[in-house]
């Protein structure tokens, strides 16, 4: 072998091992590290039965099939009626959502607002917060149903002055039989494990948009077009030196048919790129090294994973003459074949996690590539280039 060929082999080997190590760390090493640290350094939240004034905020867009049930769910939650207000907004819906909100408002069940044109979730949330009178703001997706005692459980965490954000549990109700929802549920069980581990340290990155609450004074106006605010809002609170925690007693569930789909994953990936663009421009990260470490490990590595996958696969293919890399290439090929088999609904249903896990992993990362392509071509970005100052992130001094 020529010296040049040896150098190419060395570079290919480095690409493989660095890529494989980062993928393994991002999806296995980091969650286990958070789990171990959470057990060692866990300081329980000081919960108590408190009843501050609470505002439950529900933005909705074309949720006509579920909005009436959502409103009934909200008004029947166990919380003193004189301490709870429910605010629901229709964001330019073209179905029966607006009419249902108007009916509920006229009946005195909620405070509602119906926008004639779509303005985006961030703009609607800004308006709802402006209308709200509660000391605690609780956000909930229109498509989710909240268990009756969840508000009381959520609010009890705010008895601890260290806590600024509390997330409830997100539960996906499996209602289809094609395996797609099963793959989504598998992912959410994994993600819940990661967030619970982070929460034991008081540093949970992101909350479940299905149900989470914050202290009112910690809400900063969102730039119109902001995506994935259920990640950005908790991070702003963490940067101010307050805790973001998890409460398994507060539960919100959603029909799996509302959640599955490749286009939805593309939208979430675009939101993740937006988060990164916003947060990495914020000053003060060096004063929050632990939070920066979590951001890099939990979020940045996830965004890099599609490229790490391609690099690892290509480098092992280049080094195919070596027995060790031949095994690695074969293992990756089998994994990708399993993912392709998962495209078939019958095989996905019968294969269980053996098919569902590779299928969902590859789907999520393929969505990340499509999302980045759209960003580069500037198609369908909405407010992807929101100004970083709009979130008013202030690092703790």
Where are these regions (language model features)?
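Short aromatic/hydrophobic "clamp" motif used to bind/position activated sugar donors
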Residues: 137
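A conserved acidic beta->alpha catalytic loop
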Residues: 73, 90-99, 117, 144
């Amino acid at each position: 072998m020529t010296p040049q060929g040896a150098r190419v082999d060395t570079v290919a080997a480095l690409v493989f091992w660095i890529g494989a190590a980062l993928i393994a760390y991002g999806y296995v090493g980091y969650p286990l590290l958070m789990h171990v640290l959470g057990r060692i350094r866990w300081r329980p939240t000081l919960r108590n039965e408190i009843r501050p004034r609470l505002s439950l905020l529900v933005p909705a867009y074309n949720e006509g099939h579920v909005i009436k049930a959502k409103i009934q769910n909200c008004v029947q939650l166990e919380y003193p009626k004189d301490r709870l207000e429910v605010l629901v907004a229709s964001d330019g819906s073209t179905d029966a959502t607006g009419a249902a909100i108007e009916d509920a408002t006229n009946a005195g069940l909620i405070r509602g607002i119906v926008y004639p044109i779509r303005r985006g979730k961030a703009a609607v949330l800004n308006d709802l917060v402006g209308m709200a009178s509660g000391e605690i703001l609780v956000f909930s997706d229109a498509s989710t149903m909240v268990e009756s005692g969840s508000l009381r459980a959520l609010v009890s965490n705010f008895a601890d002055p260290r806590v600024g954000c509390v997330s409830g549990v997100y539960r996906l109700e499996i209602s289809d039989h094609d395996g797609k929802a099963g793959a989504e549920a598998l992912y959410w069980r994994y993600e819940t494990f990661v967030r619970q581990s982070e929460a034991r340290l008081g540093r949970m990155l992101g909350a479940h948009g299905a149900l989470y609450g914050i202290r009112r004074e910690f809400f900063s106006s969102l730039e119109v077009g902001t995506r994935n605010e259920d990640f950005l809002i908790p991070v702003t609170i963490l940067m101010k030196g307050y805790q973001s925690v998890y409460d398994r007693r507060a539960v919100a569930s959603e029909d799996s048919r509302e959640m599955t789909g490749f286009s939805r994953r593309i939208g979430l990936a675009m939101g993740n790129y937006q988060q990164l663009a916003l947060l990495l421009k914020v000053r003060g990260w060096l004063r929050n090294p632990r939070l920066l470490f979590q951001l890099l490990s939990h979020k940045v590595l996830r965004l890099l994973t599609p490229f790490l996958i391609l690099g690892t696969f290509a480098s092992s293919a280049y080094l195919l003459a070596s027995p060790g890399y031949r095994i690695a290439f074969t293992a990756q090929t089998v994994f990708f074949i399993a993912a392709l088999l998962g495209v078939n609904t019958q095989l996905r249903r019968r294969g269980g996690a053996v098919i569902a896990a590779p299928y969902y992993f590859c789907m999520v990362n393929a969505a990340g590539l499509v999302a980045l392509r759209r960003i580069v071509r500037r198609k369908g970005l909405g407010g992807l280039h929101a100004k970083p100052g709009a979130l008013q992130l202030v690092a703790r001094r």
